[in-house]
Amino acid sequence: MKHLRKCTALLLAVLMVFALAACGQKDDTAAVDKDLTVNVVSLNGTTGFGMAKLMADSKAGTAALNYSFTVETDPSNATAALVNGTADIAALPTNAAAALYNKTDGAVQVLALNTRGVLYVVTDGTESITSFADLRGKNVYVPVQNPTFIFQYLCEKNGLTVGTDITIDNTYAQPAELNTALASGEVHIAVLPEPMVTIARAANPDLTVALDLTAEWDKVAPAGSLVQGCVVVRKAFADAHPNEVKAFLDEYKASIEYLTAEPDQAGQMIEEAGIFAKAAVAAKAIPNCNVCFVSGADMQAPLTEFLTALSTVAPQSIGGKVPGDDFYCILK
């Protein structure tokens, strides 16, 4: 009888362990509200590339959350959606994220960095350019906004005074316009982002990449601090739905890892999602797009350093000041 009681007690203990494990699994599943619609805005181009696999999973019904995706060409549409509450999460240029944070008194926060530097100096072979010193006295065509601010900072760090030692020409304000002008031979030296570099070189085989501005940045600023793209979240949404935000980050990280591991398949997903028109071009450009996933405390130093650099040449581009610690959504 005593032996039987011991066996019974042991059996009950084992059953309790399995019961507790089952309860734990049930709680983890219940922690994510699949009835909640998470509204996400992606962008055309490299800032949106990392969202493609997640968008495909959502369409196939295999994503962890109930997503509603929108793809925008103009970042201002994404910021407007965040302000009016029709977007919960959005991909944005990092300077636009900082400007929105300052404008809304901290109503948005950065969840993760998704793109490092994507800018390159491209020439048509009529000029020999191997360093910033070779740009002295030259006219360089640069798209407006972030490309101009970044290039201006690099010029100044390399001892070139804009307007005196070098001319930054914004005649072709948008990358697509500049891409066409460069490929046709109207422009000889230009700063272009990927995937426009890939498109231009396919149209004109004489074009060459003279300078990788990410590598040039690392020579004059803290390495890894050229970070051009990110995803942000409305603070009110993050506060109300921390488990869903964590689930999004896990899926988004996996989506970005898939992009770099399977560029051909990812290129097709990018086209199908409406993030970029040509799958083959996207796939070819991916290795040069410096797509990344940096979240938590690891994202604060590089982004703060980048925004500090921008504040020295174009403080208005980040909303007038470098955001503080509350700019970063660091999940517990």
Predicted regions mapped to residue ranges:
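Flexible hinge/capping segments at coil-to-helix
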Residues: 30-33, 124-139, 162, 239-243
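Bilobed "Venus flytrap"/periplasmic-binding protein-like clamshell domains
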Residues: 35-57, 132-199, 264
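Short, polar/charged alpha-helical segment
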Residues: 37, 43-77, 83, 100-103, ...
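Pocket-flanking alpha-helical
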Residues: 49-53, 73-107, 119-130, 176-181, ...
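A bilobed periplasmic-binding-protein/Venus flytrap-type ligand-binding module shared by bacterial periplasmic
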Residues: 53-54, 119-129, 225-244, 295
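Pocket-lining segment of extracytoplasmic ligand-binding domains
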Residues: 95-96, 165, 174-269
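Secondary-structure end/capping motifs
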Residues: 238-313
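Conserved C-terminal helix/tail region of periplasmic/extracytoplasmic solute-binding proteins
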Residues: 304-332
